[in-house]
Amino acid sequence: MESLLNRLYDALGLDAPEDEPLLIIDDGIQVYFNESDHTLEMCCPFMPLPDDTLTLQHFLRLNYASAVTIGADADNTALVALYRLPQTSTEEEALTGFELFISNVKQLKEHYA
């Protein structure tokens, strides 16, 4: 069975990446992919990690309102948006999930970055 990432690339009309799976979308949105046997994870840094705890708490509260999760990168320097799809997702579900993810990232960048 073909991987969900390859099926997503097919749905987008793109060739599968040969090296690091990364898509650069307009306005500097960089989507990194991490695929396991069970999930396809999409990750996009969208702004520097806030210095004050109130702003950080605001972003963490957004996790209750959306399927897109907000977290920090491994170096604690940037906020990242995360979205996971099960490997059992159809091509249509993967495309819909990707579009939802990109829409959420654009909104986050417009309002906060």
Swiss-Prot record:
Cellular component per GO, a single term: cytoplasm
UniProt keyword Nucleotidyltransferase, yes or no: no
Q: Where in the cell is it found?
A: Cytoplasm
Q: For this UniProt entry, what is the primary localization, expressed as one broad class?
A: cytoplasm
Source domain of life: Bacteria
The conditions that induce or repress this protein are given as: Transcriptionally regulated by InvF and SicA. Also regulated by SirA.
Task: Tell me which UniProt keywords the record has, alphabetically.
Answer: Chaperone, Cytoplasm, Virulence
CDD domains tied to this protein: T3SC_IA_SigE-like (cd17022)
Matching entries from Pfam families are given as: Chaperone_III
Q: Which InterPro entries match?
A: T3SS_chaperone
Family per similarity comment: Belongs to the IpgE/SigE chaperone family.
This chain's function reads: Molecular chaperone required for SopB/SigD stabilization and secretion.
What does the annotation say about its assembly with partners? Homodimer or higher-order oligomers.
Q: What is the name of this protein?
A: Chaperone protein SigE
Q: Which organism is it from?
A: Salmonella typhi
